[in-house]
C-alpha cells in the first residue's frame, strides 16, 4: 500500500487526510526507518508495508469506533507509537498518553512528536502495572488501547484500571482472538468490563485477519489490580 493508495483507502472509509496530515505520515515513516537503524523499533521498514501494517492497521479501529466521541486516550505499550499516533494524526483533537517501559522508545516518540508538530501528546516511561496504580491516571481515560502480543487476560489487567467508568478498552488482535477472549472473560468481568462489540475484518492487499474488541467499563476495577510488575504475565487471571 503506497501513500496514494493509503490516502484513497482512508477516504473510502470517510477519513479525508489534508496535505499536512499526509506529510506527517511521510515524516513518521522516514523517522521510523532512520531511528530503526539505531534501535530496534520495528521489523517492518518497507514503505508499502509500513503504510499498510502500521499506519492503516492502526487507523482501522476508526472504521468501527467513532473517535470524535473521545477526548482522552491512553495507549499501553505503544512501542513505536502504534496505534495511538496514527489515530492522533487523523483526529488531532485527541489528548493522547503513551506508556512504555523502554526508555529508548520514549526518546524516539518524543523526537517524533516534535517533528510532526503533535500537541496534547504525553509520554510516560513506566511499567503498565505501576502506571495503573497511579491515582493521577487510574480510571481517568475515555479510551485505552492495546495493539499487543500479550494475551487478552493480561492486557485486561494492565489496561482496564486506566479506563474511566463508562469508557472503553479497545483491543486490537490478529488471528485466533476468539479463543483468547474465552480465556479472558473471567478477567474482563473481574476488572469491571463487559465485551460490547467485536469486529472481524481483513487487511487489504494481504488479506490477513484482524479483530477489534470494544470492552465497556461498567464498574470500577478493584484496588488491588493491576498486581505487581510481572505478576499479570506470570499468573494471568483465567
Curated annotation (Swiss-Prot):
GO CC annotation terms, alphabetical: cytosol
> Keywords of this protein's UniProt record, alphabetized?
Cytoplasm, Methyltransferase, rRNA processing, S-adenosyl-L-methionine, Transferase
Subcellular location field: Cytoplasm
EC numbers: 2.1.1.-
Q: Where is the signal peptide?
A: none
Binding positions for S-adenosyl-L-methionine? 77, 82, 128-129, 147
Purpose of the protein = Specifically methylates the N7 position of guanine in position 535 of 16S rRNA.
Protein name (record) = Ribosomal RNA small subunit methyltransferase G
- Native source organism of the sequence: Listeria monocytogenes serotype 4b (strain CLIP80459)
Q: What is the lineage of its organism?
A: Bacteria, Bacillati, Bacillota, Bacilli, Bacillales
Q: Which gene encodes it?
A: rsmG
